[in-house]
Amino acid sequence: MSQATASAIPSSQPKSGGLSQTCSLYLLASITVSYLASSSAVTPLYPIYQAEWGFSSLAIAFVFAVYAVAVLVALLVTGRLSDYVGRRPVLIAATAVQAATMVLFAFADGLSTLIIARVIQGLSTGAGIAAVGAGMMDVDKARGAVANAVAPASGTALGGVLAGLMVHYLPAPTHLVYLLLAAIFVAQVIGVLLMSESMPPRAGALASLRPQLSLPLATRQPILIAAPVLVAVWALAGFYASLAPSLVRSSFGLDSSLLGGVALFVLAGSAGISVLLTQRLEPRTLMIYGAAVLFAGVAIAVSSLSYHSAAAFFLGTALAGSGFGTGFQGAIKTVVPLAAPQERGGVLSVIFVVSYLAMGLPAVIAGYLVARHGDLFVTAREFGAVVMVLAALALVGTLRRASSPEPHCVRSQPKVTT
């Protein structure tokens, strides 16, 4: 029997008997926030770990890289799983593992334990992030697209600044921040247990575990349009996540633990606010604005290093963050709404694979260059120049397509079943 539209598939709305749609959306958004907060919470703690365990900037880049690689592996293997077994089972398992990983972080006694914890954290994040993103779109396509853009930035901001504040003002910060996150994850597991399933299980779960990246026909051209922006904005995120604490301390003589977290907070906080303020704009407009403002912000932030101006650095960071938020939102809105409900997990996994590759590879290269040449400022300027080039290419590419029809107007091709 032929299906006329994607809406003919089983309903993806939460069924009665569980949490309301609004509560489900907020719960799912909070899980994304927690995933990203737990990742960025490590950033302000790197100087403490370095002082206690005596490892190099290259080791920091490696710790960052293993997390990104683990996320990528999980996305490739389990990114489509929730499209087959449902959102809840994947989220319960991934979030429970996150809680256990926080306990491992809290009692880490060396670099090896830190690396192991980051690997497990990356695997659980990769398994859960596509499922939670698809779940938000299931609940409410319009608000879910906005939540998918604002929640990662909000989590990154909160994790960085809260960890920085704990380092600065509270005892045992390398324990407290993780134990707090563990408690939050446990509460979220309970919340997911109370939530109705938005994606009915169907056959094909085992086959979905074969590592692959697949996109529905309707999303292939749009993701080519969005990819340059994704690469630019997430390369920026990698720069701040890996180098910001050391950069703030070395260039401006400020306390790395607190101000390194604040730098990440300014970047991600500006991104989150920009998403909310620009959510009614067209996807292409968002990507054009995002690439242009990101270019300007990075230029100001990098220039501030030569003049040792913290004010200019944070101003540039705020502008770059605005570019990150709007650019990422534009990319999400360009691609994800075109996917049918049973395809959303797979589509989001492709988006996050591109994003984490763009975030992880430059950060690793930067860490290697710092360790080899010992010049943080030169590396930061070169990294910034690369991000600016990526932003410029994304801007030019998006403007060149400005005369073509908006990609979000394309509808997903109907599927035929017999």
Language-model features: locations:
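Helix-loop-helix hairpin linking two adjacent transmembrane segments in secondary transporters
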Residues: A147-L193
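C-terminal transmembrane helical hairpin of 12-TM major facilitator-type secondary transporters
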Residues: L286-A331
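Helix-breaking motifs and short loop linkers at transmembrane-helix boundaries and internal kinks
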Residues: G54, G86, F107-S112, P171, ...
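A late C-terminal transmembrane helix in Major Facilitator Superfamily
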Residues: I332-V378, F383-G384, A394
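Symmetry-related core transmembrane helices of the 12-TM Major Facilitator Superfamily/SLC fold
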Residues: L176-V192, A380-G397
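Transmembrane alpha-helices of Major Facilitator/SLC transporters
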Residues: L259-P283
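Conserved MFS/SLC helix-loop-helix module at the cytosolic interface between two early adjacent transmembrane helices
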Residues: L72-L111
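Cytoplasmic helix-loop-helix junction between adjacent transmembrane helices
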Residues: A117-P152
